[in-house]
Amino acid sequence: VLSAADKTAIKHLTGSLRTNAEAWGAESLARMFATTPSTKTYFSKFTDFSANGKRVKAHGGKVLNAVADATDHLDNVAGHLDPLAVLHGTTLCVDPHNFPLLTQCILVTLAAHLTELKPETHCALDKFLCEVATALGSHYR
């Protein structure tokens, strides 16, 4: 459960997440593809899995914008992300094990770019991204 201090720390990052969604989202996806190549199987139309890949940039932007949107719903992250959880779990059949892999890559990417990231904010982000990963994996059939 996110504390009031966690929520405040996360909300302070929302603007940076939105401003850098495409670049940081693409970098996060590229990190995931590089560290866990099996995740590429869900992206059969992608030919360039680098952070510069056109489709990686587009999807990375969607991912990080969805994460930024979830920061507006910190009291109900799971409820807010439920439509995406249904899509990924029942339509796309994405293995829920992949969501923690991606959120870890997001956390690493943010830590690399946010020089002002204090340990307390890092911890708050980790807790929040764990909630995101759990929510997204909740409808796997």
Curated annotation (Swiss-Prot):
O2 binds at H59. SUPFAM superfamilies: Globin-like. Pfam families: Globin. GO terms for biological process: hydrogen peroxide catabolic process. This is Hemoglobin subunit alpha. Involved in oxygen transport from the lung to the various peripheral tissues. It comes from the Eukaryota. GO terms for cellular component: blood microparticle; haptoglobin-hemoglobin complex; hemoglobin complex. It comes from Squalus acanthias (Spiny dogfish). Signal peptide: none annotated. Keywords: Heme, Iron, Metal-binding, Oxygen transport, Transport. GO terms for molecular function: haptoglobin binding; heme binding; metal ion binding; organic acid binding; oxygen binding; oxygen carrier activity; peroxidase activity. Red blood cells. PANTHER family: HEMOGLOBIN FAMILY MEMBER, HEMOGLOBIN SUBUNIT ALPHA. The keyword Metal-binding applies. Belongs to the globin family. PROSITE patterns: GLOBIN. Residues 1-141 form the Globin domain. Heme b binds at H88. InterPro entries: Globin, Globin-like_sf, Globin/Proto, Hemoglobin_a-typ, Hemoglobin_oxygen_transport. Heterotetramer of two alpha chains and two beta chains.
